[in-house]
Amino acid sequence: MHILRFSDLCAQGQARGQRVFIRADLNVPQDDAGRITEDTRIRASVPCIQMALEAGAAVMVTSHLGRPTEGEFKPEDSLAPVAQRLSELLGREVPLVADWVDGVQVAPGQVVLLENCRVNKGEKKNNPELAKKMAQLCDIYVNDAFGTAHRAEGTTYGIAEYAKVACAGPLLAAEIDAIQTALANPKRPLVAIVAGSKVSTKLTILQSLSKNVDGLVVGGGIANTFMLAAGLPIGKSLAEPDLVNEAKAVIAAMAARGAEVPIPTDVVVAKAFAADAPATVKKASEVAEDDLILDIGPETAAKLAAQLKAAGTIVWNGPVGVFEFDQFAGGTKAIAQAIAESSAFSIAGGGDTLAAIAKYGIEKDVGYISTGGGAFLEVLEGKTLPAFEILQKRAAG
């Protein structure tokens, strides 16, 4: 995928004295008092901003925060807490600028934060008039927000159409590289883990991956539907019986390519979904009518771990059990440890997956951890993300 990279422009001295507009993803969670509860995204945006400042650029940064009503600014929509945290991380004051669409004053070597871009009328619908105005603010547009790469909005797509130069920041470029390594030119065998509560939310991902991967591991409620498709009892477990035919089709598509969807041979069950519910390991064929399947069993986990250790590339989206409760965490822990020990290139994404990676302390052993959420899922579906598409188009001239 050919795109212009901001790091290359900086290295060539092309950013010196230029006005640089960075679209970052600073959409962080806040408590009721507006305090930031988790600042990973702000920290992840710092390298791009530092790069621009060190290159001698006049730097403007913006992001969305929450879901404001376009055209109506409310105090709770303000990026003020983000500006404060960014100031601390950069060791310099980061002024917050409101009503910025018609002009921004910023000198080379300075950085300003432009107020919540989703307050601007026309941002979400990618209004061309707004996009042209924003493009006039800068010499170089930098997209460094993978989390919104799947949305064609004013600050993620429109501005890139009209800016003099449009390029990818280091965070977005790293995502593109990792995705290319994992999906476009994977070292085989390529094994994907797709878990979650519902087949319906990830059906297109399962269908897309079944055409490309050598092993497709399903977990969580998704695995229960696949167990039904394999004729196994699942008791009162979460499943979607109306999607059994779709699950069978995915199994058949994999089998036609000589690949497989491993169905659990043993499971961990309980009579209730609770933190203190006693756990019992059972053969998959012996699940009782009042059982809830809440994890894969140790035999299944060991088989999957062996498969992951032998893989060339691993894509991980979703924990395979209710890992928040320790008695149902064995499967997810075994998979996390196998990925950590595997020599495969691994890419992981999705909120619950990131929580599992943090719980088992394997951050340093995962090849690439995607910050994307919805954007990561759309990549797995085989879609070209709008942000990638426009940057490729601009790079091609």
From Swiss-Prot:
Does the keyword section mention Kinase?
A: yes
Question: InterPro entries, alphabetically?
Answer: Phosphoglycerate_kinase (IPR001576), Phosphoglycerate_kinase_CS (IPR015911), Phosphoglycerate_kinase_N (IPR015824), Phosphoglycerate_kinase_sf (IPR036043)
**One GO CC term on file:** cytosol
Coiled-coil spans are none
Which Gene Ontology terms cover its molecular function?
Answer: ADP binding; ATP binding; phosphoglycerate kinase activity
The UniProt keywords, alphabetically, are: ATP-binding, Cytoplasm, Glycolysis, Kinase, Nucleotide-binding, Transferase
Residues reported in the UniProt entry to bind ATP: K202, E324, G350, G351, D352, T353
Query: Where, in this chain's numbering, is substrate bound?
Result: D25, L26, N27, R41, H64, L65, G66, R67, R118, R151
According to its UniProt record, the EC number is: 2.7.2.3
Q: Which Pfam families match?
A: PGK (PF00162)
* PROSITE patterns in the record: PGLYCERATE_KINASE
Q: Which reaction does it catalyse?
A: (2R)-3-phosphoglycerate + ATP = (2R)-3-phospho-glyceroyl phosphate + ADP
Question: Which GO terms of type biological process are on file?
Answer: gluconeogenesis; glycolytic process
* Name of the protein in question: Phosphoglycerate kinase
Q: What compartments host this protein?
A: Cytoplasm
Q: What class of enzyme is it?
A: transferase
Subunit note = Monomer.
Family named by the database record: Belongs to the phosphoglycerate kinase family.
- Pathway(s): Carbohydrate degradation; glycolysis; pyruvate from D-glyceraldehyde 3-phosphate: step 2/5
Give the species. Acidovorax ebreus (strain TPSY)
